Regions:
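Alpha/beta-hydrolase fold nucleophile elbow
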Residues: 244-256
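N-terminal cap/lid segment of alpha/beta-hydrolase-fold proteins
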Residues: 104-141, 560, 564-566, 639, ...
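Short beta-strand/loop motif that positions the catalytic acidic residue
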Residues: 381, 387-389
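Residue-level detector of structural "landmarks"
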Residues: 22-30
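C-terminal, loop-rich substrate-recognition/catalytic regions characterized by aromatic stacking residues
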Residues: 89-93, 326-329, 336-341, 433-724
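Accessory cap/linker subdomain of secreted extracellular hydrolases
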Residues: 89-93, 106, 157, 168, ...
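Conserved alpha/beta-hydrolase "acid-adjacent" motif
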Residues: 394-401
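Cap/lid segment of the alpha/beta-hydrolase catalytic domain
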Residues: 142-242, 291, 430-441, 585, ...
Length: 724
């Protein structure tokens, strides 16, 4: 016999994908104790029923029962249509805590006030440090709720148990939960200041190194043996024993720096963690994220961030001052006037910013940087993982891709899912995702992600509602404005298209028969700007802006294909293999992949998915991807090597992955330059330590690309092989 008496409660049934009936039973109503004012330890609650715990004979009986059930309508969330495809069936979600969809910021703050109770705690870590933790518990005590936690260095305002979120700051409100849909559905939301930040005790360490795991008993007992993983573990233990009304399951999420902490939560291996979502996670600050790309310092981002974020915090504080103001109206002019990097401390920071000093002290990828790369620890991850990133994320695009690759290669199959959409940093959470920088994407891509992917992910793994069975990679094709799915990323069904750079400025699949060169003169006193015009600060929409201004410069060399006679979809990393020489002793190589639109292309505001590549006008040169390589690191990031003047050498590197459709009638273009300022610091083009270089070290030089049968090439991974 199969005893199913433990399934008491209202069953919820609806028609699922492909006409399959789906059913879920909510946990039977149980009394929930009010929050203990003295914060004494409470007995951990456990769920009364999970499908995984059912005997096989029960599962068979349940399967037979499902075949006879009739679909019953339940409250669901509205789902946006996706591209040219019909909207997929609404996933089975739990009965919402909040009856009405939360479509405005005011509706969100009203719902938090009406349906949640706020608590604040100082949660003890194993070394005695107390971390400020805010917990919002659903007022509905008839159900047990999973925890959904984020840990952050940016603060968890408003502070004070009687102060609730308001609608005055949309960006801050989006940090409350992964999406407003999840606030509607109901979770125990946990927000924590990481150690040493804001109202938490202890010392903050930027990109704190992870301890080697498994932790030995002496490290566990040692008060100095702490990292973000141990703090996550200790926090979860405390929550399970001190916050009533939970179902024993924990999800961890975060965007950017909190995204790193989410990834490290998976490393902590606490058994209560069932779902983790690192979104734009900070990963490796020397190779590809935030503050360095291939060894080149991301000058404007690093300086502007640490001039504010990096200020000393002697004691816990609820306020974070972010008020550094450049003394120039234009960001390009400000950093050019700053001069050599050492002037940042001399003129502005005055050695007060600890991590800026670390940046300056570690110019190469030494042990300091290796210890701060978490990816070697991404082994045997147990929770389900949803990695999210944006194709136009100017800060942590690389981190999303690298985190997925590292976890996927070291974790059981089908536990790691990657989602990449047409978003800037955090755009999937903070915007509709229907356009960016004047380029239309045809529909509200962020709504599709939040409602079709993210909400079902957490609902399935934390509540057991419905089934979440995505493809391993759910990816948006820019240029074509379509969602596509892949079994892995980069996809296996690609073929390399190697394009040779020819002397006549042509990109060709045919190798040149003669050896030639293309040279340009690069002056560090007049570096190539990141965008045309004046801007008081970085505008991260530059990642898809028109590059015609750069093509007109004599210090930028361009190569383009003939007009494409069919669509070409590039899917994966783009490989640069240049043979380059300089009459100096160092240089940077910047390569941009560009989509050149036909001269007769027109602006579009269409909402269909098969629109042209957006709202850029005819002849526009839309940036698809760009990357820099600091030449001295062409062999090894740890061991820089000078160029011998006049001697050609191989410089090989990859541009971060793309998934872009170059449409029929368009052209492919490559731009090559030696600076991209102030996105990246200037290379003096003299082989000296750049972080301590003097004005006299910055010298103009001529750089030369060698072309021909064994010359410079770029290789694109294409889904549909098309010869330009």
């Amino acid at each position: 016999m199969c005893d199913m008496s433990h399934l008491r409660g209202r069953q919820r049934v609806r028609m699922g994908v492909g006409g399959v009936l789906e059913v879920a039973w909510p946990v039977a109503a149980q009394p929930v104790r009010p929050m203990d004012a003295s914060r004494q330890r409470l007995k951990t609650a456990t769920p009364s029923f999970t499908v995984a715990a059912m005997p096989l004979r029960c599962l068979r009986l349940l399967s037979a029962l499902l075949s006879t059930l009739v679909s019953i309508t339940v409250p669901t969330l509205a789902i946006a249509a996706v591209g040219v495809q019909a909207a997929p069936p609404t996933p089975l979600l739990s009965t919402p805590l909040v009856p009405q969809p939360l479509t405005t910021d005011q509706a969100v703050v009203d719902a938090i006030a009406a349906f949640y109770t706020k608590h604040e705690f100082q949660v003890p870590m194993r070394d005695g440090v107390l971390l400020h933790t805010t917990v919002y518990v659903p007022k509905d005590e008839s159900r047990r709720w999973p925890f959904l936690m984020t840990r952050t260095p940016y603060g968890v305002p408003p502070y004070g148990v009687d102060n609730l979120p308001d609608a005055s700051n949309h960006r801050r409100l989006t940090r409350f939960a992964p999406s407003f849909a999840l606030i509607q559905l109901g979770y125990i939301f946990v927000h924590q200041d990481v150690r040493g930040r804001m109202m938490s005790q202890g010392t903050f360490v930027d990109v704190r190194p992870l301890l080697k795991r498994p932790l030995t008993s002496d490290v566990v007992k040692d008060a100095t043996g702490v990292d973000e993983g141990t703090d996550t573990w200790d926090t979860i233990e405390w929550l399970l024993h001190n916050v009533p009304g939970h179902n024993g399951r924990v999800g961890v999420w975060g965007i950017s720096y909190p995204g790193r902490y989410a990834a490290e939560a998976a490393v902590s291996a606490h058994p209560a963690i069932r779902a983790v979502s690192p979104q734009a996670p900070v990963t490796d600050w020397f190779v590809g994220d935030d503050f360095h790309h291939n060894g080149a310092l991301c000058l404007a981002d690093a300086f502007s961030f640490y001039a504010n974020f990096g200020r000393p915090r002697p004691t816990p504080t609820p306020t974070l001052k972010w008020d550094f103001e450049p003394d120039h109206a234009d960001v390009y002019d400000f950093y050019l006037a700053m001069g050599p990097l050492k002037n940042a401390n001399r003129r502005y920071l005055h050695d007060d910013i600890a991590f800026w000093n670390e940046l300056m002290a570690h110019e190469n990828r030494d042990a300091f940087w290796l210890a701060r790369d978490p990816t070697p620890h991404f082994t045997g991850i147990k929770p389900a993982v949803l990695v999210v990133g944006g194709w136009y994320d100017a800060e942590d695009l690389w981190g999303s891709l690298r985190t997925y690759q590292a976890m996927n290669s070291q974790t059981a199959k089908n536990r790691v899912t990657l989602v990449m959409g047409p978003w800037a940093h955090g755009g999937w959470a903070r915007s509709d995702g229907d356009s960016l920088g004047g380029v239309s994407f045809g529909h509200k891509t962020s709504h599709h992600y939040r409602e079709q992917i993210e909400a079902p992910f957490f609902e399935s793994h934390l509540k057991g509602s419905g089934s979440f069975a995505p493809a391993e990679a759910e990816m948006f094709v820019t240029g074509l404005n379509q969602w596509r799915t892949f079994d892995t990323w980069p996809p296996q069904q690609v073929k390399p298209m190697t394009l040779s750079l020819a002397d006549d400025g042509v990109l060709s699949t045919t190798k040149p028969t003669s050896t030639t060169t293309r040279s340009w003169f690069a002056d560090p006193a007049h570096p190539v700007p990141w965008m045309e015009g004046q801007y008081p600060e970085l505008d991260h929409d530059y990642m898809l802006k028109d590059q015609r201004f750069a093509s007109r410069r004599p210090d930028v060399v361009t190569f383009q294909s003939p007009v494409l006679d069919e669509d070409v979809v590039v899917a994966g990393p783009v490989t640069v293999d240049f043979l380059v020489a300089t009459d100096g002793t160092d240089l940077d190589v910047v390569v941009k992949l560009i989509d050149v639109m036909p001269d007769n292309a027109t602006t579009t505001t269409t909402t269909t998915a098969v629109a042209p590549a957006g709202q850029l006008r005819g002849g526009a040169q839309q940036l698809v991807r760009g990357e820099i390589m600091r030449g001295r690191f062409r062999d090894d990031f740890a061991v820089p090597r000078a160029f011998v003047p006049g001697q050609a050498e191989r410089v090989r590197f990859t541009l971060p992955d793309v998934l872009h459709g170059f449409r029929r009638g368009h052209r492919l273009m490559i731009q090559v330059q030696a600076s991209w300022f102030p996105l990246f610091d200037r290379n003096p083009q003299t082989f000296v330590p750049i972080h301590t270089a003097d004005d006299a070290d910055f010298v103009a030089h001529t750089h030369t690309l060698h072309l021909g049968p064994t010359g410079s090439t770029i290789t694109l991974p294409v889904l549909t092989r098309t010869r330009p």
